[in-house]
Swiss-Prot record:
Residues 20-27 are annotated as: G1. Residues 11-205 form the tr-type G domain. Pfam families: GTP_EFTU, GTP_EFTU_D2, GTP_EFTU_D3. Belongs to the TRAFAC class translation factor GTPase superfamily. Classic translation factor GTPase family. EF-Tu/EF-1A subfamily. GTP hydrolase that promotes the GTP-dependent binding of aminoacyl-tRNA to the A-site of ribosomes during protein biosynthesis. This is Elongation factor Tu. Its EC number is 3.6.5.3. It comes from the Bacteria.
Length: 396
């Protein structure tokens, strides 16, 4: 009997998703990818209905329907996100529990780019999805190749408009439905698509390799030993003896050394991304550190007061506001572990924002906070969530 290949859990992990206009074939393509890989023994085939009936999830108080599919190629393990409705997409990309490392933009060759195509490209740009691969779908329904060429040109121009390298982005042509039905040419196109995703979307840097960052959740004193800051390490790692900075809420940055670490009441030499730890800090008194600040590798993150955010405002049904808001609205912005009041300025030509809208606006915080592009936040009013967003640009 032939020896079975040993399953190794060593493949790098990448998050991707399908984006694009409604009915252009995102979900059919997702199903076709799983079928093609299942035939190679690398995935479980998921049928269309299965993916389309996405379960509801609550992410930061917002209800989103999202389908999570996982599969492997020869080189990688993928988590693939597909959201059925347009509103689900918008919410998912802004609040996204899963940050996409890359996206497959599905455009029907029969229609060309449509309003949601544009909106999804804009969102991908705003929330920091750096890599897009295009799948021109339904090419079997277009008689003239020149028409398909025109659609490809339009898509490339649209991508360039939002700062993606439109001329260089890989474009694959095929039919997702054909692939699902086993048509060899279309199956080949889906194989080519996944080979391209493997190659074009770089493996993301692992969280543990990034510079150390831990939002402070709690501070307490151990008599005779000093001050301990506790929290969950967001990224990177920290070792006893490391120098760290205490950043945020105050203009000045304090430097200190980690003299001890503990987790689950046991001492620890090193903490890493995902660990809930307490860090004993040398020469820091109880008053000079507070919840909402961060501990960070020196020089790795700065505080800012002004930023642009891409934000989804909850609808009334989602427990959000019942009325619109205008420029100079002053809610709280919840970053890391604390609320900071900020003043909103709407972009030119936008009079007001209605519940259920997504919008880009500028914020001036009343205290400096350790923030960077891509950081997620919630907008709150009197303790309840009225919006969720992501920092799209730092303004100094």
């Amino acid at each position: 009997m032939a020896e079975k290949a040993h399953y190794e859990r060593t493949k790098p992990h990448v998050n991707i998703g399908t984006i694009g206009h409604v009915d252009h074939g995102k979900t059919t393509l997702t199903a076709a990818i799983t079928k093609m890989l299942a035939d190679k023994g690398l995935a479980e085939a998921q049928d269309y209905a299965n993916i389309d009936a996405a379960p509801e999830e609550r992410e930061r108080g917002i209800t989103i329907n999202t389908a999570h599919v996982e599969y492997e190629t020869e080189n990688r393990h993928y988590a693939h996100i597909d959201a059925p409705g347009h509103a689900d997409y918008v919410k998912n990309m802004i609040t996204g529990a899963a940050q996409m490392d890359g996206a497959i933009l599905v455009v029907a060759a029969t229609d060309g780019p449509m309003p949601q195509t544009r909106e999804h490209i804009l969102l991908a740009h705003q929330v920091g999805v750096d890599y897009i691969i295009v799948f021109l779908n339904k090419t079997d329904l277009v008689d003239d190749d020149e028409l398909t060429d025109l659609v490809e040109m339009e898509v490339r121009e649209l991508l360039s408009e939002y700062d993606f390298p439109g001329d260089d982005i890989p474009v694959i042509r095929g039919s997702a439905l054909g692939a699902l039905n086993g048509n060899p040419d279309d199956v080949k196109a889906v194989e080519e698509l996944m080979a391209t995703v493997d190659e074009y979307v770089p493996t993301p840097e692992r969280d543990t390799d990034k510079p150390f960052l831990m939002p402070v959740e709690d501070v307490f004193t151990i008599t005779g030993r000093g001050t301990v800051a506790s929290g969950r390490i967001d990224r990177g790692q920290v070792t006893v003896g490391d120098e760290v900075e205490i950043i945020g809420l105050k203009e000045e940055i304090a430097k200190t050394t980690v003299t001890g670490l503990e987790m689950f009441r046991k001492t620890l030499d090193q903490g890493q991304a995902g660990d809930n730890i307490g860090a004993l800090l040398r020469g820091i008194d109880r008053e000079s550190i507070e919840r909402g600040q961060v501990l960070a590798k020196p020089g790795s993150i700065q505080t800012h007061k002004n930023f642009k955010g891409e934000v989804y405002i909850l609808s009334k049904d989602e427990g959000g506001r019942h009325t619109p808001f205008f420029s100079n609205y002053r809610p709280q912005f919840f970053f890391h572990t604390t609320d900071v009041t900020g003043v909103i300025e709407l972009p030119e030509g936008v009079e007001m924002v209605m519940p259920g809208d997504n919008v880009t606006f500028t914020v001036e915080l009343i205290s400096p906070v350790a923030i960077e592009k891509g950081l997620k936040f919630t907008v709150r009013e009197g303790g309840r969530t009225v919006g969720a967003g992501v920092v799209s640009e730092i303004i100094d």
